[in-house]
Amino acid sequence: MPLTEIIAGAALGLALQILHEAIQRAKDRSLTTSCILDRLDSTILRITPLMAKVEKLNKESDESLRKVFEDLKHLLEKAVVLVEAYAELKRRNLLGKYRYKRRIKELEGSLKWMVDVDVKVNQWADIKDLMAKMSEMNTKLEKIMGQPIDCIISEDNTNMDIVERVDPSLEAKAGCSNSDSKPKIDIHLRWSKQSKDHGIRFVLN
């Protein structure tokens, strides 16, 4: 069944649909690093039927359970911003891409537990248990979305150029492997201030 049919009329389902479309756009713009986006998109598609099913029951639930869904909807909207920002990064900004991919991987991991959830429509106790787990998930997602990724410092008469180098094979592993191995990143920072050139170099493992 098409995703658009599954989520018709559902606010949370619409948020999932928007995230799915953002992932597709990001994949089109970042073909060499689409593996992590494929995994996130696969998880989104697999949990959408469950979300649509439970959201129908949610209309009859109490305020606290409705808040769980509302919080998740807002977090998914933030996830759209995360995915779109990742797609906007320039290809040479490898450090930025690595950090965004790590955040996207954490996002996918936080959602993935719902793939195997089987909730029967007539078992309200199961629904409440699911809502409790979703509330915990929302807390984790809030931490993921709230972590700063970029820090930009601007001063008058100062120009800064950042050059990053990383082994492409290691970068691919960071995005497509299930391991937690990190690429070695060699960073050169060069800037000029008051007609003087400055530079610093460091390596991130």
Swiss-Prot record:
Factors inducing expression: Expressed in leaves after powdery mildew infection (e.g. Erysiphe cichoracearum UCSC1).
A Pfam cross-reference name: RPW8
GO CC, any one term: membrane
Keywords tagged on the record: Coiled coil, Hypersensitive response, Membrane, Plant defense, Transmembrane, Transmembrane helix
PROSITE patterns (alphabetical): RPW8 (PS51153)
Protein localization: Membrane
RPW8 domain segment(s): 1-153
Coiled-coil regions listed in the entry: 70-92, 125-147
Main location group: membrane
Bilayer-spanning residue ranges: 7-23
GO terms under biological process: plant-type hypersensitive response; response to fungus
Topology in membrane: Single-pass membrane protein
General function of this protein: Probable disease resistance (R) protein.
Family: Belongs to the plant RPW8 protein family.
Protein name (database record): RPW8-like protein 2
